[in-house]
Amino acid sequence: MTAKVLLPQPYPRVVAHRGFSKACPENTLPSFGAAVALGADEIEFDIWPSADGELVIIHDPSLDRTTDKTGIVKEMNWAEIAGADAGVKFGEQWRGVRAPRLEDVWNAFAGQMEFNIHVKDPGEDGFVIRKLKQLAEKYGVTDQIYVAGIHDVMECMLQYAPEMERCCLNGQNGWNLVDKGIEYKCGRVQFANRYCNEAQINKAHDAGIVCNLFYADDPDEAARYYEIGIDSILTNALAEVLPIARKSTFGLE
């Protein structure tokens, strides 16, 4: 299966954090569809493996917070997870929305934007990374994704998928993120707000590394980060932050 060609988007960019999560249930197909419709440059989502080897799009290690069921994702089969309602806790109008698999996301949206994939657990012998690579090749999106994670994920990426883009989160809660990004040969790093300043951004850019920020929902805050050189901002408030990025892209006042 081959995705349509995706033209590179200019920087600065807006990354829809778990989709358009301010308006829709996070990490669901409606949330991603809304982000596509609004014109997000990238979607960020999280992956956990199920007990029977499916790559499930969900942030937490358990179903408890975002669905009407309980249980640890890694200890449950996909059929059990698919039976959980991932919409109703966000609002009655979302009843019936389910947590998708990675394949479901790419069936719907491959070729429409880039994907920032936060791998929470690389799996035994890098299973998650190896399957992610296999699916990316199947859906023709290898050049439309990058994988974010801490040290165990970065090490598995270097071992099992060195050709795929990496985004370093290791050192995010400190001042050594850029050094870790260089160590893991990453094309991107993702700063946390409190440890992001112009000097760190310049250091990353000097090393040829693209800089993400996690996160900004306030338009004025987003504008300040764009002004000091951040390349991409993760946000839950897509409708509010997207116009700020477009002003920065085209030099509008």
Residue ranges and their predicted role:
Residues 1-253:
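Phosphate-group recognition and catalysis centered on beta-loop-alpha active-site segments
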